[in-house]
Amino acid sequence: MGHHQNEKLTKKLSEFAFDFSYDDLPSEVTEQAKLFILDTLGCALGGRTQAIEEVSWITMFAGSQNSTGNSTIFGEKERTSAATAALANGAIAHTIDFDDTHMPSITHLGSSLVATTFALGEELNSNGKDIIE
């Protein structure tokens, strides 16, 4: 693919993302997204209760970053930066290794995506609809 074709594709993708709305999603997609989020939050809760030592190391590392912001680490009261919260929450959600697996790529997308969207959502004062959108 040539440089000009890449620019066209990038332009199309950026226009699609800019014009995209929650209302464009079929209800099946929003319901699946909610289940995906709940599954990841359940894994994070499982990590907080079953992988106490690992979570302790994660939260200790996050606290050492001395970062400020409006985002929280799952199960903590203190606020931190979106980057620190995303990293810590993704690690916490993956501690018990029960998070979803995308089989073609053999990756655990939920722990990364949900952690990042929640951290950014808090930073931007977004609601659940905004996060799914």
Regions found by a protein language model. Give the residues of each.
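N-terminal core-entry segment
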Residues: 2-133
